Amino acid sequence: IRDSYILVPGEAPQSATDTLVSLAKSMGFGTIKYCTQQKHDRMIAYTSQIPHVLACAYVMSPRCDEHSGFSAGSYRDVSRVARINAELWADLFLANREELADETEELVRNIERIRAAVAKNDRAELVALLSSAREKKEKFG
């Protein structure tokens, strides 16, 4: 398994943590990451919940009704996780509401920076923003 096993030990005894680490290794997890509950919740908001927020917001556009024949890989890639179990994800979002609200604000700020550059016809700023995003993706995956 290439994926990581995330362990939030909290106040668990070391023996319990050791047992979970052994289990994760026996299952073939490639990496075992330790973190606090707060770090876990922040990273889940960023890595899992924000993509669902983005996909759902994206397909809520009236253009979604008309996309057939115009869309290809980009549409499919961004919208895939909008096929959501609404009951489950509403509970997950609300259980992590503070972290998700903060991450959503960050996403909106970044979208606004791109929107402003487009609206101002500011090619230099747009290239800088897009280049910065590409560099981050290349560096961090």
Language-model regions, residue ranges each:
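Internal alpha-helical scaffold of NAD(P)-dependent oxidoreductase catalytic cores
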Residues: R2-V81
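A generic membrane alpha-helix/interface feature
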Residues: Y46, I114-R115, F140
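Interdomain hinge/lid region at the active-site interface
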Residues: E66-A133
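Short, charge-rich amphipathic alpha-helical segments embedded
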Residues: E135-G141
